[in-house]
Amino acid sequence: MHPAHLLVPLGVCVSLLGAARIPPLPLSLVEFRILIKCANHNSRNVLDYADYGCYCGKGGSGTPVDELDRCCQAHDYCYDDAEKLPACNYRFSGPYWNPYSYKCNEGEVTCTDDNDECKAFICNCDRTAAICFAGAPYNDENFMITIKKKNICQ
């Protein structure tokens, strides 16, 4: 066999190994997106919140730029508190990986009673944030602000 023929199977194996390491989308973040859409009556694309201000999206630092960014900061802190709960401290049970039950009825978000302690806490974090988002004005200038103004969130 020609050595070049070994490159194809090797490439496939390396690709499969790489794909196996791609993490799935955290489950409760999917639900959080649904709660945002429910509370906001689908008025905004949920991706508009993915990189807004200093706290909306992954991570967060500095001073929130406005009321909506403060909603995201409070949500981040709520998730931090969830990770400290004994009921949420084992692998795949924290705020990002723990799916919970909820209801959405005409813009009203309710966390259902069948959630355990950890799921109930996470659901309430997301519910509170979704309601906060619905009441806070959205300033287009603050979308992707960390790219527009490099040092604003330090």
From Swiss-Prot:
Q: Which family does it belong to?
A: Belongs to the phospholipase A2 family. Group I subfamily. D49 sub-subfamily.
GO CC terms, sorted: extracellular region
Source organism's superkingdom? Eukaryota
The UniProt annotation places Ca(2+) binding at: Y55, G57, G59, D76
Q: Where does tissue-level expression of this protein occur?
A: Expressed by the venom gland.
Principal place of residence: secreted
Q: How does it assemble?
A: Monomer.
Question: GO MF terms on file?
Answer: calcium ion binding; calcium-dependent phospholipase A2 activity; phospholipid binding; signaling receptor binding; toxin activity
Q: Where is this protein found?
A: Secreted
Name the catalysed reactions: a 1,2-diacyl-sn-glycero-3-phosphocholine + H2O = a 1-acyl-sn-glycero-3-phosphocholine + a fatty acid + H(+)
Enzyme Commission identifier(s): 3.1.1.4
Query: Which EC main class describes this enzyme?
Result: hydrolase
- GO biological process terms on file: arachidonate secretion; fatty acid biosynthetic process; lipid catabolic process; phospholipid metabolic process; positive regulation of fibroblast proliferation
Q: What is this protein called?
A: Acidic phospholipase A2 2
What keywords tag this UniProt record?
A: Blood coagulation cascade activating toxin, Calcium, Disulfide bond, Hemostasis impairing toxin, Hydrolase, Lipid degradation, Lipid metabolism, Metal-binding, Secreted, Signal, Toxin
- InterPro entries, from UniProt? PLipase_A2, PLipase_A2_Asp_AS, PLipase_A2_dom, PLipase_A2_dom_sf, PLipase_A2_His_AS
Q: Which residues form the propeptide?
A: 20-27
Tell me the disulfide pairings in this chain.
Answer: C38-C104, C54-C153, C56-C72, C71-C132, C78-C125, C88-C118, C111-C123
Indicate the residues that form the catalytic site.
H75, D126
Q: Briefly state the protein's biological role.
A: Snake venom phospholipase A2 (PLA2) that shows moderate enzymatic activity and exhibits procoagulant activity. PLA2 catalyzes the calcium-dependent hydrolysis of the 2-acyl groups in 3-sn-phosphoglycerides.
Note accompanying the cofactor annotation: Binds 1 Ca(2+) ion.
Which residues belong to the signal peptide in this entry? 1-19
Organism annotation: Pseudonaja textilis (Eastern brown snake)
Q: Which cofactor does it need?
A: Ca(2+)
